[in-house]
Every structure is written in structure tokens, then in C-alpha cells.
């Protein structure tokens, strides 16, 4: 089985990705990013994205309650279902799940990072 990560940036060619997936004969799971969709929804709703940089140089997005709502709308809603639709149009029988569904993915909360001001 293959696990394939597809980025969530605005430059991702999903039509090309799905065409490549249609040629795969082995079972696969796609992990789909949606950061561009999240940023677009944030702009539409007037929510300003806050980026943080740790002292080690790692960048991340601060996620307050409104940002979490936008993340869920983008990842499990728009991007997920549009990708499933595109797969179905290309004869790939697909289902879109998130890590929240049936606790498919569980992680440990980061205890915090030291942020550069």
C-alpha cells in the first residue's frame, strides 16, 4: 500500500495528481493538504493569519478557535470533498475522511514552543 502526501499550496495541479493516481494499480491512501484553501477562507472572513517562528526557525500558524474552524472547513470540507469529486470523475472510487473521524489519527498536543519576537 502507498501513502501519498499531496501538498495544500495554491500551485498544486490536482488534475495532474488525480491522473497519476488513476494509473496506480496498488491500494493507496492520500493525505491531502489544504493550507491555500484555509488562507482563502481566512481572507473571505476577515480572519488574519498569525504566523509564529520558533527560536529554532520553525514556522507555524497560530490556531485560535476561529482558525481551527477555518481549518476544519478547508481540510475536511472544501478540499476533501472537491478532491473526492475529482477522483470519482476519473474512475477512482474514493472516500474522504479526516483524522477526527473514528479517531483515525490521534496526536499529542505540543506543550508549547518558544517564539521569536
Where does each model-flagged region fall?
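Nucleotide/pyrophosphate-binding catalytic subdomain
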Residues: 1-117
